[in-house]
């Protein structure tokens, strides 16, 4: 089977799936991505695309994302046409269409099955936007969100089938497309991400943390309100007042992945450090760190705080559970799909730093009960989010799509012969 992956940041969500398919000699795996993408060592046949230009400044700002998507789609189509000219015709294309790259796949390869990864469908109410009253949504923002979904609607109509990683993320898409979308989480490697009570973690100041220390961890791609960074810092201030030995270890960059940047040019980290009073000797900002070091941090964590507005569920929460962390998660819809309060984690009010701090303190005060919750957290990932489960489900839908195309081609050929 010839498989083509399209993802601007390949491998992205397809890291494990691409490796799994590439390991089978029956498959030829090819990928298309942007030049900055990390790529995958097991997929050497990776081609890059480069949009001809950026969206024009004169384009209406509601349509910048759409124009960007069209430019990306055109650039990918040029690569596809070259591959087609060289004789390559994929049996299936697996794409993250969020940036427009898959818009014209069917125009180049009409018979090829297109499996698209549907991560999010935007709403001005009921999801991320307008959730946090500290960051209200303007009418202009509402209109921009409605327009932004035009690209996603094109993607939904173009694909043969879709994947969403959680039931909640699927539910955000228009009901008329639900029959197209299967829920398959890409999966967590539970063998690699596992508890290790003998692990140590050395801080930049030379202090060595172990599983016996009071260690509160927080991880995000970037430190920003979408992932509750402001509420975490306020809760950390409260814990710092209550307990003298707690260390706070924070992983994440100073950029903004989602939402708006601060209007004054500061980072959210700078703004929160001006607001809260925390002993700087116990507050450790690590920035972005290598994956192995991140896993070691999870393994010494006493309480892992994961806060998010209703948005895409982070891999880091499931990885923390797989590592045996006590996860203190916001009582928001994507988190509730996985965490059951008191059973495999603790749910807290996103808007209450005191409630978050109380849950952190519970992690230090009820060791025997917390151990049961930790074990249940890992078991949840093993039973429902383990890598092998995701790969198996992906394999089934891929085989089904390709088989349906083969069957359709056979019927068409038979009709011609008659």
Question: In which residue ranges do the predicted regions lie?
Answer:
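Conserved acidic donor-binding segment of nucleotide-sugar-dependent glycosyltransferases
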Residues: 341-342, 346-353, 362-367
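Acceptor-binding helix/loop patch of EC 2.4 sugar-transfer enzymes
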Residues: 53-63, 112-150, 191-196, 200-202, ...
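Short hydrophobic beta-strand element within catalytic cores of glycosyltransferases
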Residues: 326-329
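Conserved donor-binding/catalytic core segment of Leloir-type glycosyltransferases
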Residues: 202-227, 233-238, 248-249
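Carbohydrate-associated surface elements
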Residues: 168, 187
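Aromatic "clamp/platform" in nucleotide-sugar-dependent glycosyltransferases that forms part
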Residues: 309
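Nucleotide-activated donor-binding/catalytic signature segment of Leloir-type glycosyltransferases, i.e.
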Residues: 256, 261-288, 292
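A short, well-ordered alpha-helix in the C-terminal region of glycosyltransferases
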Residues: 362, 369-384, 390-396
């Amino acid at each position: 089977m010839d498989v083509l992956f399209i993802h601007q940041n390949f491998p992205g969500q397809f890291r494990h799936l691409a490796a799994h398919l590439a390991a089978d000699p029956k498959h030829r795996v090819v990928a298309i991505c942007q030049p900055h993408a990390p790529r995958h060592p097991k997929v050497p046949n990776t081609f890059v695309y480069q949009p001809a230009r950026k969206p024009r400044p004169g384009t209406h700002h509601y349509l910048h994302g759409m124009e960007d998507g069209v430019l990306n789609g055109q650039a990918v189509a040029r690569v596809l046409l070259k591959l087609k000219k060289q004789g390559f015709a994929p049996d299936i294309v697996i794409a993250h269409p969020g940036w427009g790259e898959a818009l014209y796949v069917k125009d180049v390869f009409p018979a090829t099955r297109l499996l698209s990864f549907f991560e999010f469908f935007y709403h001005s109410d009921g999801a991320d936007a307008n959730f946090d009253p500290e960051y209200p949504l303007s009418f202009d923002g509402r209109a921009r969100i409605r327009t932004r979904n035009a690209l996603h609607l094109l993607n939904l109509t173009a694909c043969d089938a879709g994947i969403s990683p959680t039931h909640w993320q699927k539910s955000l898409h228009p009901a008329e497309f639900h029959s197209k979308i299967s829920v398959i989480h890409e999966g967590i490697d539970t063998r690699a991400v596992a508890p290790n009570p003998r692990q140590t973690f050395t801080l930049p100041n030379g202090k060595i943390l172990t599983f016996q220390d009071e260690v509160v961890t927080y991880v995000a791609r970037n430190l920003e309100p979408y992932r509750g960074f402001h509420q975490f810092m306020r809760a950390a201030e409260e814990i710092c007042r209550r307990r003298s030995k707690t260390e706070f270890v924070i992983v994440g960059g100073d950029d903004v992945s989602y939402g708006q940047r601060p209007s004054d040019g500061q980072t959210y980290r700078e703004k929160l450090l001006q607001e809260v009073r925390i002993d700087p000797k116990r507050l450790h900002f690590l920035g972005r760190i290598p994956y192995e070091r991140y896993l070691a941090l999870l393994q010494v964590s006493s309480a892992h705080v994961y806060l998010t507005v209703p948005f895409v569920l982070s891999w880091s929460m499931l990885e923390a559970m797989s590592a045996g962390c006590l996860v203190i998660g916001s009582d928001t819809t994507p988190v509730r799909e996985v965490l059951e309060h008191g059973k495999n984690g603790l749910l807290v009010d996103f808007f209450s730093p005191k409630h978050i701090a109380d849950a952190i303190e519970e992690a230090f005060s009820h060791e025997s009960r917390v151990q049961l919750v930790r074990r249940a957290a890992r078991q949840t990932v093993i039973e429902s989010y383990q890598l092998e489960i995701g790969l198996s489900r992906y394999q089934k839908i891929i085989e089904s799509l390709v088989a349906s195309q083969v069957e359709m081609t056979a019927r068409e050929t038979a009709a011609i012969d008659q």
